[in-house]
Each structure stands twice: as C-alpha cells, then as structure tokens.
C-alpha cells in the first residue's frame, strides 16, 4: 500500500478509536490532520480497495452495525462542501454512489437542487434555499456559497460598469437592504467608493487601445500565396 495512504488509514483508525471513547479533543486534532490529505486523496485513481479504505469505510460495516441516523445528513453536508469548493465533477461522482432511495432523502435532495440552481445561474433560488435547509448545520455552507456568488457577481460588475446606484447594487448583489450592501462594500471592497447614492467602482483594468487591422497587407499576402500555389500546380 502507498505509504501516504497507509498513514491516512492509521490516522483514520485512531480517529474511530477516539470517537468510540468520546475523546472529542483527540478527534478534533486527528480530523485536522486528515484534512491535510484531502488533495492527495482527490488524485487517487478509482481503485475499489483505496475507496473502501479511505472514503467508503461505512459500506464495510453496513451489515455489522446499524446505520447512523446522521448518515444522510453527513452525506448531504459533504455534497455541499464539494459544491462550495466548486468541485462539481466530484459532486456528481458522489451522487453516482448513492441509491435512488437515498437520493430522495431531504438532506441529499436539497444539495442536488442547490447544485442545479447554481449551475443554471439562478442565484436567487440559491440564496432563498437557505430558508429551506433541512438542518441548521447546512447554514454554514449556505453562507459560504452566498459569499462565493456575491464575490463572483462583484468581480463581473466592476469590470462591466463604472458605477451603479445603491438600489441597482442591492439588486445586482442580491441584498435586501442598502445597509447590507454598504456593509459588504466596507468589508470586502474598500477600494469601491460610495458617494451621492452611487457605488463607484475602482477600475482595475487598463483599456488596451484597439490596433488597426492591416487589411491591405493581408490581402497582398493572400494574393501572393495564391500565385505561388498556381505556379506549384
């Protein structure tokens, strides 16, 4: 077995042992260490043994211990984590491992509908989905996703406009009040200026001058190539 994979497996075994005896301080420490291997695990090939060892341990014990009542909740949170990190391919890989009955569970269904809205660009639906989250633990990831969406819109807006009115800014960035917009500007974009009821963007790009296309030169070159081809033929 790969040495790094062996280390991950050993750390995971220690994590399980600490969890069984309710040593949550050790659990927290080991979980932090396991997170460091996250990107390494992404690069692994889809080998059944590796998956069973590192990612799908619960499948091995399904017939030995009763399913956790939190199983669907945790799987739903993992899907949200992948969505927030924009790891869409892995999101769909995880979905492919779930049964049709599991896909109908509210915790899973909520994450699937959220991904569909996100990919369609229906950002209002994404933000409003926070109110229908199946569990309060989802709110953390929903807030991260909302920030990701607003940052993306903000980046596009400052490149497309010189300024926006505060009301237009609220609508564009999906805020329900002027104060929310002002707080966002102060915390996330101090380079923007708010004055006279406008949000003035600080231009970060330089407009490159358009170069004239040397059309006559291109025509002459094309005719020259044509004459050369005629000689060859």
Curated annotation (Swiss-Prot):
Location of the PCI domain: 38-217
Listed GO CC annotations: plastid; proteasome regulatory particle
InterPro entries, A to Z: 26S_Psome_Rpn12 (IPR006746), CSN8_PSD8_EIF3K (IPR033464), PCI_dom (IPR000717)
Organism per entry: Arabidopsis thaliana
Protein name: Putative 26S proteasome non-ATPase regulatory subunit 8 homolog B
Subunit structure: Component of the 19S regulatory particle (RP/PA700) lid subcomplex of the 26S proteasome. The 26S proteasome is composed of a core protease (CP), known as the 20S proteasome, capped at one or both ends by the 19S regulatory particle (RP/PA700). The RP/PA700 complex is composed of at least 17 different subunits in two subcomplexes, the base and the lid, which form the portions proximal and distal to the 20S proteolytic core, respectively. Interacts with UCH1 and UCH2.
Record's keyword annotation contains Acetylation: yes
Protein's gene: RPN12B
Pfam families: CSN8_PSD8_EIF3K (PF10075)
Keywords: Acetylation, Proteasome
Function, in words: Acts as a regulatory subunit of the 26S proteasome which is involved in the ATP-dependent degradation of ubiquitinated proteins.
Positions where N-acetylmethionine occurs in the chain: 1
Family in the record: Belongs to the proteasome subunit S14 family.
Gene Ontology biological process terms, A to Z: proteolysis
């Amino acid at each position: 077995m790969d040495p790094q994979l062996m280390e991950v497996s050993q750390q995971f075994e220690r994590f399980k042992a600490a969890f069984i005896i309710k040593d949550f301080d050790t659990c927290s420490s080991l979980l932090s260490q396991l997170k460091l291997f996250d990107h390494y695990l992404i690069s692994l090939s889809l080998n059944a043994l590796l998956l069973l060892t590192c990612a799908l341990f619960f499948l091995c014990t399904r017939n030995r211990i009763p399913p956790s009542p939190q199983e669907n909740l945790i799987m739903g949170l993992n899907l949200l984590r992948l969505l927030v990190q924009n790891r869409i391919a892995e999101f769909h890989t995880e979905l492919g491992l779930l049964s049709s009955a599991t896909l109908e569970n509210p915790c899973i269904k909520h994450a699937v509908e959220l991904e569909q809205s996100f990919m369609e660009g229906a950002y209002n639906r994404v933000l409003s989905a926070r109110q229908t989250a199946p569990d309060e633990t989802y709110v953390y990831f929903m807030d991260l996703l909302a920030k990701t969406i607003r940052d993306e819109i903000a980046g596009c807006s400052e490149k497309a406009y010189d300024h926006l009115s505060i009301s237009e800014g609220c609508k564009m960035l999906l805020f329900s009040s002027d104060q929310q917009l002002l707080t966002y500007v102060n915390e996330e974009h101090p380079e923007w200026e708010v004055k006279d009821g406008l949000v003035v963007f600080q231009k970060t790009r330089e407009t490159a001058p358009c170069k004239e296309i040397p059309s006559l030169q291109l025509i002459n070159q094309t005719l020259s190539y044509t004459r050369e081809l005629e000689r060859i033929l």
